[in-house]
């Protein structure tokens, strides 16, 4: 990796659950071994990650291959310069915010992002793209979050993930495979703390497909990520794990709200303040 001038990843897995039968301790060893390489690539190189559409991805999205290819190229070729401009007010608001409050069915979570900054993503390193992220103060997270989007991590598919936090740490975790999810969170001490908070707003991505490059950008979504923090918004958390788990807050998924310092930022997947409305799907397409 240190000999690379740039890193371009074109990925198209044919079996997202290929590692589902590998013991958790082996996967943890793999993650710990790979993490220094990933950290160098993310922090020290010029890089971009994209997919190549195939039948497996179409199946995950519940589409025919032809329909998925049309969707894929529509998403990947949208006007990212327009997105970059539209997200600037959200970057400013997030960078200045202190207290964040997430509300929704089964979710009541508070944390601080004070002093950790915010980063906008509009096609520079991910294609597709569409998010603004920050990071919680490590020990500020308290409450419960109930995710409503399936997630594949370390080869295992998880559904109905529910995490309870006390002073930043996951003190209770349940899911469709509760044993496996806790084994992942026991990879290292940092895996039970949070390394990223992000709001997603790509207007073309509406439904989950168990591919996080797409799912974390879903319009009206957020992701609250356990494990390793990014250097751009660094709360000091270190882990071999970086698990983006997605909560969709549009009405058909139960709705929900995002508050910054007692100001309503988004309700039921729609941005509320006037300066953020250009990020709503009907305006951003």
Regions picked out by a protein language model, each given a short descriptive name:
Residues 138-183:
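Long, well-ordered mid-to-C-terminal structural blocks that present hydrophobic/aromatic surfaces
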Residues 172-238:
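Dual-mode signal for accessory low-complexity, basic/Gly-rich regions
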Residues 102, 164, 258:
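Short aromatic-centered micro-motifs
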Residues 144, 151-157, 162, 268-285:
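Charge-rich, low-complexity intrinsically disordered segments
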Residues 142, 158-160, 167, 192-196, ...:
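Active-site lining segments that contact anionic ligands and/or coordinate catalytic metals
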Residues 210-284:
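Internal helix-turn-beta structural module
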Residues 1-142, 279-285:
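Active-site bordering "gate/hinge" segments
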């Amino acid at each position: 990796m240190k000999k690379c001038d740039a890193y371009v990843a074109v990925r198209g897995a044919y079996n997202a659950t290929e590692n589902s039968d590998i013991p958790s301790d082996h996967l943890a060893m793999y993650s710990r071994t790979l993490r220094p390489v990933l950290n160098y690539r993310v922090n020290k190189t010029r890089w971009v990650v994209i997919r190549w559409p195939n039948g497996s991805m179409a199946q995950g999205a519940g589409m025919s291959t032809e329909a998925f290819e049309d969707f894929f190229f529509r998403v990947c070729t949208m006007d990212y310069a327009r997105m970059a401009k539209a997200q600037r007010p959200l970057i400013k608001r997030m960078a200045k915010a202190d207290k964040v409050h997430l509300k929704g069915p089964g979710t009541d979570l508070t944390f601080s992002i004070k002093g950790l900054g915010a980063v906008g993503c509009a096609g520079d390193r991910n294609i597709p793209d569409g998010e603004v992220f920050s990071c919680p103060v490590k020990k500020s997270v308290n409450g419960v979050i109930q995710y409503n989007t399936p997630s594949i991590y370390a080869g295992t598919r998880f559904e109905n993930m529910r995490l309870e936090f006390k002073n930043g740490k996951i003190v209770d975790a349940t899911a469709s495979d509760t044993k496996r999810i806790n084994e992942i969170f026991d990879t290292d001490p940092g895996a039970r703390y949070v390394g990223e908070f992000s709001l997603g707003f790509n207007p073309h991505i509406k439904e989950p497909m168990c591919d996080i490059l797409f799912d974390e950008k879903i319009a009206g979504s957020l992701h609250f990520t356990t494990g390793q923090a990014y250097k751009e918004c660094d709360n000091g958390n270190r882990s071999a794990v970086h698990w983006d788990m997605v909560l969709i807050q549009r009405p058909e998924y139960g709705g929900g709200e995002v508050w910054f310092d007692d100001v309503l930022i988004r309700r039921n997947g729609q941005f509320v303040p006037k300066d953020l409305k250009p990020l709503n799907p009907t305006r951003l397409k």
